[in-house]
Amino acid sequence: MARRLATASLAVLAAAATALTAPTPAAAAPPGAKDVTAVLFEWKFASVARACTDSLGPAGYGYVQVSPPQEHIQGSQWWTSYQPVSYKIAGRLGDRAAFKSMVDTCHAAGVKVVADSVINHMAAGSGTGTGGSAYQKYDYPGIWSGADMDDCRSEINDYGNRANVQNCELVGLADLDTGESYVRDRIAAYLNDLLSLGVDGFRIDAAKHMPAADLTAIKAKVGNGSTYWKQEAIHGAGEAVQPSEYLGTGDVQEFRYARDLKRVFQNENLAHLKNFGEDWGYMASGKSAVFVDNHDTERGGDTLNYKNGSAYTLAGVFMLAWPYGSPDVHSGYEFTDHDAGPPNGGTVNACYSDGWKCQHAWPELSSMVGLRNTASGQPVTNWWDNGGDQIAFGRGDKAYVAINHEGSALNRTFQSGLPGGAYCDVQSGRSVTVGSDGTFTATVAAGTALALHTGARTCSGGGTGPGTGQTSASFHVNATTAWGENIYVTGDQAALGNWDPARALKLDPAAYPVWKLDVPLAAGTPFQYKYLRKDAAGKAVWESGANRTATVGTTGALTLNDTWRG
C-alpha cells in the first residue's frame, strides 16, 4: 500500500477505460514452483522489459511486479503513482504501448507480470493528470461522480471500527463505494483491460479498506480463473479488520513476517527461526505473500531495508531459502527524503547507478532464486544452530544453506541431505565437495552465507552457478583494527558492490592482521577497488590514496597482497 503518512496507506483505485466482458469467476492462482516475484518499484516499463531479459528470466524469477500503470496526479513524489485520476495507462512509467511491449518482452523471457492495482480510492485535490485528464475530488469525468463514493467524507480515524476503516477516506482520498454494482463493474473493467494486455496477476493495494465480500464480487468479474491475486492487508493487533478475512479471494501479504525478521536479525538470535512461519501464528503458507521490505516499510522503519547492510542481505537469503509463503524481492532506489520519487523519472540506465539499488540482481539474492526453484516442495531438514546467530538447514535432498550473522567465521562440518559429489556454493562461487553421507566441511565468513543445490553442481557453467570463464580475486590486506572494527572491500564491479559502502564485502579476520576474502569474477576482468573499515555502529572510513587496480587472469585465481593505507 502506498502511504503518504506513516500510519495510513495511499491506495489509488480503479475503474476501467475499456469495459471488457469477464467470463467465469476467477479463483486465486498461486504462482507455482517459480514463486519469487521481483518488485521493480517505480521502474519505467521499458526498464522493466530490459530487466526481464537481462536478469529476471535468467535468474529464474517467476514474476515481476510493476508499479501502478494508470494515469495519476502530477508530481515527482513516488506516492503520486498511488493517486489515480483515470484508468488510462498514461502514468509516469509509460504509456499503453510501452506497457504492452514490456509485458510481451517479459513473457518472452519466461517472466509473468503482476500489476500493482489501486482500486480503493481516487485522487484528492484537483488539476490535470499525467495523461491530460481533468479532475477534482469526487468528480472524475467519464468515470466517477460523487454518487459513486462512500457517504463518509472524513478521514479514517478509528482502526477499531470496521465501518470507519472501510467506508471513510484513507488520508483524505476519495473512497469508492465498492458495494455498488456499477463501481464493481468499472473496477473489473479496468482489471480486465490490463488482462487484455497480457497481465498475469494483480497486487490489490489497500485491500483492508474494502470489505472482503466486495473484493470477492469484483474478482468474480475478472479473468478466467487463472489470474493471481495478492492483497495488501496490514495486520494490526486488536483491529476490527484482519488480513485473514481476505484469504478466500487470493493470497494475502503477511506483514508480521517482515517485522519479525527485523526483530530477530537486529535484537534476537537466528536460532529462533527454526519454526518460522505458521507456528508463529502467521496465515497459511500457501496463501501468504512475504517480503523483507516493501516501498512503504523501508521508509517507515518497521522492517529492515538496504541501509542495514549484511543483516538485510542475509534476511533476503533466509527468505528465499525458507519454505514459507511466496517471496517478493523489493528492488528500489536510495532515498533520504521519504517522499522522493524515482531517479531519472523511473528510467534505469544501469543497475547501481543514479541511486538504483537493484536488489533483485544482487548476486547474494539472485543466486537464491534458482535454489528456491530447485527445492520447491522440499521440507526443512538437518537444522543446526549454535544457539546464536549461526544457522544451517537443508531442503530435503535438493539444497542446503548456512547463514552466519555473527562477527567471526563459521567453520564446521555440516550434515546435509544432498547426494555426494561436487557443488557450487552459489553465494561465493567456490566449489564444495559433499561426501556420500551428505557431510561437507566449509568456512562461512562473518556476515555471509553458503548455499548449495542440485541445480548448481559446478561453478564453471551449468546449473545456476557462475558461468563459463568464472574465476576469482583473492583479497589479502594487512590491517590492524580496534575492537569492533572490521575491514571491507568494494569496487567498480557488481560482485564488489559497485562502490556502495552498504554493499561492501567483509573480509575474514581468521589470519589477523591479514584479512582475506575470495570474490568470484569473470576471467580477464579489469577492475578498481579500495578497502574501508567500519566500526560497530557501521560508520565507514575509507583507506587513503587512489583507487587500486587489478585484472583477473584468464586461468586461476588472482591473489592480491595489500597493506592498508592509513
Curated annotation (Swiss-Prot):
Give the top-rank taxon of the lineage listed in the UniProt record for this protein. Answer: Bacteria
What protein is this chain from?
Answer: Alpha-amylase
Query: Which organism encodes this protein?
Result: Streptomyces limosus (Streptomyces albidoflavus)
Keywords attached to this Swiss-Prot or TrEMBL record, sorted alphabetically, are: Calcium, Carbohydrate metabolism, Glycosidase, Hydrolase, Metal-binding, Signal
The family classification in the record reads: Belongs to the glycosyl hydrolase 13 family.
Q: Which reaction does it catalyse?
A: Endohydrolysis of (1->4)-alpha-D-glucosidic linkages in polysaccharides containing three or more (1->4)-alpha-linked D-glucose units
**Cross-referenced SMART domains:** Aamy, Aamy_C, CBM_2
User: Which residues catalyse the reaction?
Assistant: D205 (nucleophile), E232 (proton donor)
Annotated binding of Ca(2+), by residue = N120, Q166, D175, H209
Named cofactor requirement(s) = Ca(2+)
